[in-house]
């Protein structure tokens, strides 16, 4: 989810309601001589946990049905059950997305 702020937001903010917000891709943008901050963010509950944040980021882009579909189509193609060259491309994009998330989380939590 994209969010906009008037001041640079923190990467991790813990709220009093038992949830926390993790932000990444934080960048300063200037529009009509007004500076704002834009970032991607997800809200999770409980104590801050990298695995929860990773899953929330994945679910922000891929619901479980779509994720399983990509994996199943790739496996079906690899095993020769179906011929679907797009399955390899879609699975590779998905794996690159997961790698990007890992790189984001390695930058700091």
Region roles according to the model:
Residues 2-109:
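A preference for well-ordered globular domain cores
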């Amino acid at each position: 989810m994209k969010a906009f702020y008037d001041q640079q937001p923190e990467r991790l903010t813990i709220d009093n309601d038992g949830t926390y917000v993790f932000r990444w891709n934080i960048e300063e943008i200037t529009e009509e001589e007004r500076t704002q901050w834009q970032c991607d963010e997800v809200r999770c509950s409980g104590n801050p946990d990298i695995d929860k944040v990773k899953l929330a980021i994945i679910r922000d882009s891929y619901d479980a049905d779509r994720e399983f579909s990509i994996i199943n189509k790739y496996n079906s193609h690899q095993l020769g059950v179906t011929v679907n060259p797009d399955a390899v491309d879609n699975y590779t994009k998905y794996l690159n997305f997961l790698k990007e998330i890992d790189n984001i989380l390695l930058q700091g939590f």
